[in-house]
Amino acid sequence: MKQTTLQLPVMPRRRFVATGVGAAALLAMAPSALASDDLLEHALSPRMIGSDDAPIRVAEYYSMTCGHCADFHNDTFPKVKSKLIDEGIVRFEMRPFPLDGLALRAHALVRAVPEAKFFPMVKMLLAKQPVWVRADDPVTELQKMARLAGVSADEFNGIMRNRPLLEGIVDLRQKGADDWK
């Protein structure tokens, strides 16, 4: 079967009510990938959901602080997942495209946790985006969210100071910008 890659624009949808649905899924998981020596390789690897045999590939470039991206993930993505991804029609890849320093830190966090936590954590952070993005101290709020995923304060601080990880995410962003000029 011929595979096709499709880039979908992220479009604004109605405002959402932040929920803690993703938080419950995160509470039960341990942060084992945070302690591994190959954190950088793990964190910069592709994040995909859906069948390897899906005939359509979708790559979404998103920013953790983008309101439109949050709207898409809170309002539209559940429908895309149930109708296209879960049915084996689409394989969906999420690619980081941080628009600011806070988004860069949030991307570093979600990419540093074990892969099984990635999608639930992205879901939680985007659902609760107004809480942490608009806070007086957004990094502290992000750290509170990280605790729900079992990320200790030391692990969180290590992720935030991991220059190769942060630079790797910026490189992924730049590659996306260069590839889709």
State where each predicted segment sits.
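N-terminal secretory signal peptides
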Residues: 1-12, 22-31
